[in-house]
Amino acid sequence: MKVLVIPDIHLKTWIFDRAEKIIKDGKADRAVCLMDIPDDWNMEFQIERYKETFDRAIAFAVDYPDTLWCYGNHDVSYPWGRLETGYSPYAERTVMSKLEELENSLKSPAQINIMHRIDNV
């Protein structure tokens, strides 16, 4: 099985577009997203960008329901109150609600975790 590892997103929606193309082209059977969806340098006031990025992640989760999701330090920094570089207090509510929306869009809660095992690896 070929597994596509989607790297840290950090507000870059185009990464999901590229991942989608790779899967559609048959170069991967499934994906694992390393998340780190929020936060990027000098983007703390760009709340719409946060929304757009999470919405793209949610759309990807719906379109590719076997995708596994690994929380990154930037994702958990919001609910855990452990601020990371690039943390946006202005986007906090958005991140928290969109993260919950992403979790609820998955067919199983087991699809999102700190780590995953695929084929005993």
Please annotate each region the language model reported.
Residues M1-L4:
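Extreme N-terminal starter segment of soluble prokaryotic enzymes
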Residues V121:
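Binuclear metal-dependent hydrolase catalytic cores centered on His/Asp/Glu-rich metal-binding motifs
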Residues I6, T13-I118:
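Core catalytic region of metal-dependent phosphoesterases/phosphodiesterases
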